[in-house]
């Protein structure tokens, strides 16, 4: 009987700490003072870890220094992806901000460095060097 990767990993109990970019890639967009960041799993077996750990609260804490007023997460399970809409994070938006990155395009990179705990059994599905 085949055990799904997440169930096998949970049974082993071992975890490794890795940044989010080892599990997923991301893309940022903007509209006014709102940023949206898409997070897409590199492999379907990593989806459950993303749903469990890349939450609205985790994202809000990650962007705490930018003082977002609201973070919403939208799950796209058939695509093994999620989209975050983060309000009031661009210092007024493109026309009002003095930031070098007024579109917030680098925000995905900030999120992709989020540390996660991944079951060791899922290590073969992680991107990049160990």
Language-model-derived ranges and their functions:
Residues 2-130:
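Long, contiguous binding/interaction regions
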């Amino acid at each position: 009987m085949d055990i799904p990767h997440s169930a096998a990993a949970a049974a082993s109990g071992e975890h490794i700490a890795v940044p989010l970019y080892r599990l997923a890639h991301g893309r940022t967009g903007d509209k006014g003072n709102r940023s949206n960041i898409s997070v897409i799993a590199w492999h379907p077996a990593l989806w459950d870890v993303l749903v469990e750990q890349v939450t609205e609260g985790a994202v809000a804490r990650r962007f705490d220094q930018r003082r977002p007023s609201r973070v919403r997460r939208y799950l796209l399970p058939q695509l093994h992806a999620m989209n975050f809409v983060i309000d009031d994070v661009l210092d007024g938006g493109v026309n009002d901000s003095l930031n070098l990155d007024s579109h917030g395009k680098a925000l995905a990179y900030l999120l992709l460095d989020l540390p996660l705990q991944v079951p060791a059994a899922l290590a073969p599905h992680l991107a990049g060097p160990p």
